[in-house]
A protein has these predicted regions:
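Predominantly extracellular beta-rich ligand-binding scaffolds that present long acidic/polar faces
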Residues: 1-221
Length: 221
């Protein structure tokens, strides 16, 4: 990914509509940089009032090392800005971000519009669901602020969503309770996915690389 960003379908979608689309696979970013980048299961950066992702899904394993708020990682999109909209869509899988300060979440990493610095131009989420285990992030949006343009969002009660923090010079792993939306159990999640959209994802071959960082949530207490 590096300084360019990456998405399962597109690195950047500007004033574009993506409907009834899906991605299944692994995305790995091992590049170390302080520059901004955006990584998403479907789209790295979704920008513009006419930019829409609708009736879509991503089944992902994302391994990343985002380490600042302008480095974004999301199960559907990394950065959603300038009134762009994700609706009737969901992500499932795992996101393992090995550093602590990125904007990381199961649906969208970052919604705030940096150019206008106004919440009325932030990205929008409607009828979205996160069924994603997340390390060092949140379930729905990775950056929380007042007045977020999010309606009808859902997450899986059984997902492990954690952040690693420092408390009194001790590294502590704590559950992330921000941006959970309406929390559903496993049976409700399955029903809600079908209600949101009924896309089927084609089978793909496993991508094997020497730089893969595996998500191992069994070690989280």
């Amino acid at each position: 990914a590096g300084e360019r960003g990456i998405g399962g379908l597109l690195a950047k979608a500007e004033q574009s509509s993506i409907t009834e689309s899906s991605f299944k696979g692994r995305i790995v970013n091992s590049y170390e940089t302080r520059s901004p980048y955006n990584i998403g299961g479907l789209v790295g950066q979704l920008t513009g009032i006419n930019a829409v992702v609708d009736k879509s899904k991503a089944t992902i394993v994302i391994s990343s090392n985002a380490d600042s708020t302008n480095q974004t990682v999301g199960g559907l999109a990394g950065l959603v800005e300038k009134d762009a909209l994700i609706s009737n869509s969901y992500a499932e899988g795992d996101i393992n971000n090995v550093k602590r300060f990125g904007s990381v979440a199961g649906v969208a990493g970052y919604l705030w519009d940096r150019d206008s610095n106004e919440e009325r131009h932030a990205g929008r989420l409607h009828n979205v669901l996160s069924d994603v285990n997340v390390m060092n992030g949140n379930a729905i949006s990775g950056y929380h602020y007042r007045g977020m343009r999010i309606t009808d969002s859902y997450s899986n009660k059984d997902n492990r969503v954690y952040k690693v923090t420092l408390e009194k010079d001790e590294v502590v792993t704590k559950e992330s309770l921000e941006e959970r939306g309406t929390i559903l159990n496993a049976s409700q999640i399955a029903s809600k996915k079908s209600e949101i959209n009924s896309l089927s994802v084609p089978a793909v071959e496993t991508l094997l690389t020497s730089t893969n960082k595996e998500s191992d949530f069994s070690k989280v207490e």
